[in-house]
Amino acid sequence: MEDLNIKLNAHFAGKVVRKDLTKKIKEGANVPVYVLEYLLGMYCATDDEKSMNDGVQMVKKILSDNFVRPDEAEKVKSKVKELGKYTVIDKIGVKLNDKKDIYEAEFSNLGLNGVPISSHYVKEFDKLLAGGIWCIVKMEYYFDEESKGTSPFSIESVTPIQMPNMDLEEMFEQRRQFSKEEWIDVLIRSTGMEPTQLEDTVKWHLLERMVPLVENNYNLCELGPRGTGKSHIYKEISPNSILVSGGQTTVANLFYNMSTRKIGLVGMWDTVAFDEVAGITFKDKDGIQIMKDYMASGSFARGREEKNASASMVFVGNINQSVDVLLKTSHLFDPFPEAMAYDSAFFDRMHYYLPGWEIPKMRPEFFTNEYGFITDYLAEFLREMRKRSFSDAIDKYFRLGNNLNQRDVIAVRKTVSGLIKLLYPNGEYIKEDVEEVLRYALIGRRRVKEQLKKIGGMEFYDVNFSYIDNESMNEEFVSVPEQGGGTLIPEGMNKPGHIYTVARGKTGMIGTYKLETEVVSGNGKFEKTGLNSDRDAKESIDTAFRFFKANNKNISGTISTTTKDYLMHIQDIHGVGLTGELSLAAFIALCSGALNKPVQSQMVVLGSISISGTINKVEELANVLQVCFDSGAKKILLPMVSAVDIPTVPPELFAKFQIGFYQSAEDAVFKALGVE
């Protein structure tokens, strides 16, 4: 047995289990891991191979005899009737029957309801009223002809499959026996993964998945490829979290039911996780609004009352494209449904964006065969730690930089607090430990902010997150690994007739457009593709061609509009809808193609012209320049009329470009082609 296993068994006897046993039985039994490990903990808490094998056989026997499979429900009911008494393992929920003034249990797999249950179980295990819990239930059967209308089934005893109590002080004491690296491995093995097969960054991501279970009102988003185990921990590992599969949900179910006056899932569970975020829809119009209110403050108003709850929110979903493509053409929150995808206020409430693409797809060798905590013990530890806070752990050693606003600070503090609860639950940490956690927290929040900048523009411009050492006063900046994704506009020379412009699209978002022009022998025809049926875009391209026909001799006597055909394709790279501000870019593209001379490399031309040649000002210059920068532009051609708006642009953004100004459309052509 390896050292860590020996250590675990020595310091946490009876609270650890060999995870390959879970795996072996799990593959054949459709029960949550925490139910399985509860039984394994009862019968297999030993390192003696023979006793362990006997224990495994015992657990298998219990599962085959007592675990209720939905298709065998009638068979089990018959057993209860014939034997008079029988023990079952099932998920039971309880409702109050106010007409009879009794509590009635509902069996999930057995399909029984209306079974009377003693009120003392309900008081002791209030989760029975909130979605139900897995229990070992001793049932009795007694049919009385006189008491018609009542169920012949009754409940003799209920044993919830969860830890009865948790001694945190003992946990703190034993934590001292393990190094940081060992403790991380123990936590990861407790969730069923094998840390020796994983890189350090992946280990940190797996720990981050646990933060919503240990921190109150924590909002986490994880989007990534399929098969990376995004929802596993919330569905299988913790009995205190609920996974809401993507699809329609209601305010009553999630928050508060006005008619029954019952609080919804956020009041019953420690974590509410939404699987497949792309499918989230609310029946109620105000659903997203209430969710935003809850994510910001931990409270929500329904009717006349304001309710508080402490459940964390987790959003997991799939990214169907590569991250590079997504960053170039859209933003990392793109998989969210349309009602949320461009709602910057909603995403600003996310405390952390976990990059699911950095976690490998799960393969058999990633699952552990070593010892880890019984899932229930781990879940109870996480639950108890919710009552504590380490959000001030930063202050002793560091200050946060001035680019972080109040929401950023709250997000970073919550992440730091959650990770310290997991790694140093006894509060025994040093400066380097805090710095490591702080850097990780800043990166995840900056990833949120970078996307907000793409969605909401200049309002979220401050993304240069940093922290300052209280002793040395050194300022350290953190960056996001995938930041280098934004080169839609490639380096090197374009082909003649190709040009980029940035403008506001039909959806209200600012996007990048590429115009490609081909000039072939012909008789003066002009064809345009890529416009679909967009009237404004068509008009602006037609304006450009009419202006080109009327004014091409001002550019060069060699241009012909009678012996050549012009073909133009317009591409909406960001997918934000076409724009009516393409006229100037189209005019320059036509001249560039006709002269067979390329536009300067990595240049974006801004502005538009009317049929008479009047230059129109660029609206929202700062936001437009931000999109230019994100798209990879190095040179900008601006109309002189926009010079008055330059003070609205942050100096550090303005300094990123070589900026040229033009007075007229002809002037713009010469400057774009680099001709003096």
Swiss-Prot record:
The identity of this protein, by name, is: Lon-like protease BrxL
Per the record, the similarity remark reads:
Belongs to the BrxL family.
Q: Which lineage is the organism of this entry classified under, starting from the top rank?
A: Bacteria, Bacillati, Bacillota, Bacilli, Bacillales
Q: Which Pfam families match?
A: BrxL_ATPase, BrxL_N, Lon_C
**Which UniProt key words apply to this protein?**
Antiviral defense, Hydrolase, Protease
Q: What induces it?
A: Part of the pglZ-brxL operon.
Q: Which GO terms describe its molecular function?
A: ATP binding; ATP-dependent peptidase activity; serine-type endopeptidase activity
Q: Entry's InterPro entries? A: BrxL (IPR013473), BrxL-like (IPR014061), BrxL_N (IPR046838), Lon_proteolytic (IPR008269), Lon_Prtase (IPR027065), P-loop_NTPase (IPR027417), Ribosomal_Su5_D2-typ_SF (IPR020568), Ribsml_uS5_D2-typ_fold_subgr (IPR014721)
Gene transcribed to yield this protein: brxL
Q: Which GO terms describe its biological process?
A: defense response to virus; protein catabolic process; proteolysis
The transmembrane residues are none
Q: What does this protein do?
A: BREX systems (bacteriophage exclusion) provide immunity against bacteriophage. Part of a type 1 BREX system. This system allows phage adsorption but prevents phage DNA replication, without degradation of the phage DNA. Methylation of bacterial DNA by PglX probably guides self/non-self discrimination. When the brxA-brxB-brxC-pglX and pglZ-brxL operons are transformed into a susceptible B.subtilis strain (BEST7003) they confer resistance to bacteriophages SPbeta, SP16, Zeta, phi3T and SP02 and partial protection to phages SP01 and SP82G (these include lytic and temperate phage).
